A protein has these predicted regions:
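Sec-dependent signal peptide hydrophobic core
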Residues: 5-9
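C-terminal motif of bacterial Sec signal peptides marking the signal peptidase cleavage site
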Residues: 14-17
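Buried hydrophobic residues that stabilize the cores of well-folded domains
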Residues: 21-270
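Positively charged n-region of N-terminal signal peptides that target proteins for export
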Residues: 1-4, 20
Length: 270
């Protein structure tokens, strides 16, 4: 199953020097930063999710401006998405998995996304899909619900938190069939790559790390279990397990029990 990963930039280190003579040299403006994350292959060399490189570019204010995802084997561009910022608003344009993407996002006074209207058009067939995502937050600034509206149908996801950790999400279909529950157990690794926003966000979960989707969990999950219900009876369960290594307070690697592994390369970020 394809996993949508998000990557959090670490705090930049500010170096100061002292001198008896006053230095009137102006402080240089920060420059845009790029960081790349490489997704590896399983131990047997069989590609699971594709040999993919993810590159994230940020502006001088450390805001995400571009996501570039490309397969290394054949140089196929999976995603190339651009972000433009204005007061209380983000515009998104680009391509994602064979679709032209446009989206308009509304932010509240805390910089959290409250609504996204998204349109995707197939580059081969012209098929068009229009969706609206509505987001709510609890008193602690954590995501409480997301509602996806498409062709008049609504699908709501509810998030359950305990002690600052996301423990489960519940997806209510509004019918007797297809309700889903995602449940998580936590690890000791810091939350720098997230799984819980997959398919809830219009393919731009990376904005989570700018605070656009509220407060992050404290730690990464050690397990992620998906259970599908029909008429209240569980009919399918799939569990993924994750093992991490951390270097200098940052994620270095993530190994999944299904065989896929990820290596993280970090740029100097705010």
């Amino acid at each position: 199953m394809k996993k949508l990963l998000l990557f959090l930039a670490a705090a930049a280190v500010i170096f100061a020097s002292c001198s008896k003579k006053k230095d009137n040299t102006p402080t240089p403006e920060p420059t845009p930063v790029t960081k790349t994350v490489l997704a590896g292959m399983d131990a047997s060399g069989i590609t699971l999710y594709g040999d993919v490189a993810y590159t994230y570019t940020y502006d001088a204010d450390y805001r995400l401006t571009n996501i570039y995802e490309v397969t290394l084997s054949d140089n196929y561009v999976v995603r190339d998405i651009n972000f433009t910022y204005s007061d209380g608003h983000i515009s998104i344009t680009g391509i994602t998995e064979g679709y032209d993407l446009t989206a308009e996002c509304t932010l509240d006074e805390q910089g959290r996304m409250t609504e996204m209207t998204r349109s995707v058009v197939s580059t081969t067939t012209g098929f068009t899909s229009n969706r609206t995502f509505i987001y709510t937050y609890d008193a602690d600034g954590r995501m409480a619900t997301t509602t996806q509206i498409s062709e008049g149908d609504e699908l709501t996801h509810t998030f359950v938190w305990e002690n600052g950790e996301l423990v489960s999400t519940y997806t209510g279909t509004g019918t007797a069939n297809g309700d889903m529950v995602l449940s998580f157990e936590t690890s000791d690794a810091p939350a720098q790559a997230l799984f819980y926003l997959m398919k809830y966000d219009g393919d731009v979960s990376e904005l989570c790390h700018q605070g656009c989707f509220g407060t992050l969990p404290v730690h990464m999950p050690s397990t992620r279990s998906l259970t599908v219900y029909m008429n209240g009876i569980p009919i399918h369960t799939n569990t993924s397990e994750y093992v991490y290594t951390v270097e200098n307070g940052r994620l270095a690697t993530c190994q999944e029990n299904e065989g896929s592994s990820f290596t993280f390369h970090w740029g100097m970020m705010k």
